[in-house]
Each structure stands twice: as C-alpha cells, then as structure tokens.
C-alpha cells in the first residue's frame, strides 16, 4: 500500500472511545520495548510518527492510527513491564482483552517478539490467548539485524518451538533500521484487511 496520509485519531481506554468509521483494523501487540512503534513507523514511511521510547510501559492507551482513510493500525499497550503496578497491569489487561474479543472491525493481530531471545512467558501466554480466540495472527521477530543472518533459522526454530507454532505458520524477520520484512508484513496486512473484498 502507498502510504502518504496517516493520522493518530484516537487514544482510547474503553469501547465508547473507539473510532466509528468502520475501517478494518490491525492490532500490534508485544511486550514493552519490543519495537511496536518502530514497526509502525517503517510501515507508514515515517521516521518518528509513532513515538518510540526507551522507557518501557509508555503506551497506556489503545492508539488508533488512520492509514489513508482505509484502515487503522491499533497500537496496544506493551505487556510484561515489571515497574507498572499489578493493579495497572490488570487494568491494561482488561482493556486489551475487551478490544481484542469484542471489536468487529479487527481483522488480524501482529504479535511482535524479540528475535534475539526465546519468547518470554508473557509472549507465550499472549500467543496462546490469540490462538484460543482464533484471531488471525502474524508473528514478527523484531531486531533481526542484531543477530547474524546465519543464525536466523535457529531463531525461527526457537520461536516456533516456544510458541508451539504449526510449521505452516510464517514468521517475518524484521529490522526497522534496514526496513527488512516491511513488504512481507504489508502483504499479510492487506490480505487480512482487504482480502475478502
């Protein structure tokens, strides 16, 4: 998709605040600091539209980005950040669950994991939860440029084993600085958002 116009239209905490335009939505989930904002910026051809932060736990709302008046990217609060209080984590969890299970416009979820490490327990729980609710999910392994290309197969195998992924499921190796994996992610987004049209 050619992207020239992007707008952050809403930061929501409950369904009453969600946009009402009816465009298909793609949610981005992952633990704090895994690179959701960096992925968003690469996908929309901006350097710093979605704010990247070295401070985990920064996103505390569902941020709806209108892309070309055709779809929304929904940046979901990062999970697994220890310094956030238990009450705060539970509140985020409820907000995220409400959105992911009740939003009719949701067409798919991009679940981000760090290519350099085995998926965390939080990553595994999130993937199982998405699978339980039968939400179409693409696994994107971020920060792939930080590991030698010769070790990619090993990284993919580790992710598939930890998440118990079927062999048919693809994992996109992604690097924000090199914009590597961008086309593969967009192909999946377009198939999910507009495939039935």
Curated annotation (Swiss-Prot):
GTP binds at residues 30-37, 57-61, 75-78, 142-145, 174-176. GO terms for molecular function: GTP binding; metal ion binding. The gene is engB. Necessary for normal cell division and for the maintenance of normal septation. CDD domains: YihA_EngB. This is Probable GTP-binding protein EngB. InterPro entries: G_ENGB_dom, GTP-bd, GTP-bd_ribosome_bio_YsxC, P-loop_NTPase, Small_GTP-bd. It comes from Levilactobacillus brevis (strain ATCC 367 / BCRC 12310 / CIP 105137 / JCM 1170 / LMG 11437 / NCIMB 947 / NCTC 947). Its cofactor is Mg(2+). The lineage of its organism: Bacteria, Bacillati, Bacillota, Bacilli, Lactobacillales.
């Amino acid at each position: 998709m050619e992207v020239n116009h992007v707008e952050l239209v809403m930061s929501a905490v409950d369904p009453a605040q969600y946009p009402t335009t009816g465009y298909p939505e793609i949610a981005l989930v992952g633990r704090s600091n895994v690179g959701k904002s960096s992925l968003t910026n690469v996908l929309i051809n901006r350097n710093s539209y979605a704010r990247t932060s070295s401070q985990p736990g920064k996103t505390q709302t569902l941020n709806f980005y209108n892309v070309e008046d055709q779809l929304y990217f929904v940046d979901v609060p990062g999970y697994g950040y220890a310094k956030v209080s238990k009450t705060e984590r539970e509140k985020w969890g409820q907000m995220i669950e409400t959105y992911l299970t009740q939003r009719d416009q949701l067409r798919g979820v991009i679940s981000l994991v760090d290519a350099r490490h085995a998926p965390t327990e939080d990553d595994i729980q999130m993937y199982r939860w998405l699978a339980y609710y039968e939400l179409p999910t693409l696994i994107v392994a971020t920060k792939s440029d930080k590991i030698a290309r010769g070790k990619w197969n090993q990284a993919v195998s580790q992710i598939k084993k930890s998440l118990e992924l079927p062999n048919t499921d693809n994992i996109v190796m992604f690097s924000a600085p090199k914009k590597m994996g961008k086309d593969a992610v967009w192909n999946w987004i377009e198939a999910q958002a507009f495939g039935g049209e």
